[in-house]
């Protein structure tokens, strides 16, 4: 929304931003941007815009841990009536805590538990709660194969059950997981423009022409993304498909016996590999 339209829109509530420990740096950047953007806005001085312009929208909140490794969420200021946004990076493994004298790096499960603790401290007080989770927790476990748990669906239902109104993520592994919470807001933002912009900026000699470049999907799961990028760039698309031995099961999966390539000749071309998710080594 442009700044000239702000006077026609009443804020849902006083803005509050809670970047969890995993997202402190990006949270500060978001806060600085909003402070600058709002200071330039021409809004009236009515009661609807009270506290609209402030020096910071970040709410003082922490998740300290006990010696046992357990934790609790603490708000050091009121969030009553606020429109609260929580930022969390469940893949930030740089954070660590001590349990019985041993150092443990935080896993996605740890980050998700801290998120729920903070929501529990907020629920019933904030006017609206929105979770911004760039990497959707448990997104790779979006469907059931045999006797498996549906972790991503359960995680989304947990969040909405304890008071979350909106969930925002980026390029969800499978956006259809939002069917788990059909009556709640779930947004998966596609950063296609940012991806292409970064590619052209960091690889200045790349040429988006069919004779110079090709998009390749490593498997069928990423084919939709590869086709989209190929159409945007105006280049050819290729893919691999996995031949599996369905007579055996190794580590819970049918083993791959070969990768077959389907596509045009890649000789002399710049190849951009588009995958839906890049796990260690496997793809």
Residues covered by each model-derived region:
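PRPP-associated nucleotide enzymes
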Residues: 1-283
């Amino acid at each position: 929304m442009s700044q000239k339209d702000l006077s026609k829109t009443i804020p849902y509530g006083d803005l509050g931003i809670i970047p969890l420990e995993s997202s402190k740096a990006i949270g500060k950047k978001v806060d600085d941007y909003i402070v600058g953007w709002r200071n330039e806005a021409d809004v009236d001085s009515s009661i609807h815009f009270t506290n609209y312009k402030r020096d910071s929208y970040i709410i003082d909140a922490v998740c300290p841990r006990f010696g046992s490794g357990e934790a609790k969420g603490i708000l050091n200021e009121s969030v009553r009536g606020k429109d609260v946004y929580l930022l969390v990076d469940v893949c930030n493994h740089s954070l660590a805590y001590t349990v019985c004298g041993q150092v443990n790096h935080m896993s996605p499960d740890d980050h998700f538990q801290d998120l729920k603790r903070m929501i529990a401290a907020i629920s019933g007080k904030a006017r609206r709660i929105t979770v911004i989770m760039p990497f959707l927790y448990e997104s790779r476990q979006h469907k059931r194969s045999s006797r498996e748990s549906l972790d991503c669906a359960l995680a989304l239902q947990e969040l909405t059950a304890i008071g979350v109104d909106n969930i925002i993520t980026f390029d969800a592994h499978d956006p259809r997981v939002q069917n788990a919470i059909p009556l709640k807001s779930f947004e998966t933002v596609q950063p296609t423009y940012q991806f292409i912009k970064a590619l052209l900026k960091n690889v200045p000699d790349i040429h988006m022409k069919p004779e110079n470049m090709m998009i390749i999907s490593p498997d069928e799961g990423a084919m939709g993304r590869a086709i989209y990028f190929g159409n945007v760039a105006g280049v050819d698309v290729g893919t691999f498909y996995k031949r599996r031995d369905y007579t055996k099961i190794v580590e819970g999966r049918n083993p791959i016996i070969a990768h077959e390539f389907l596509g045009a000749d890649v000789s002399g071309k710049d190849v951009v590999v588009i995958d839906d998710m890049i796990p260690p080594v496997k793809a």
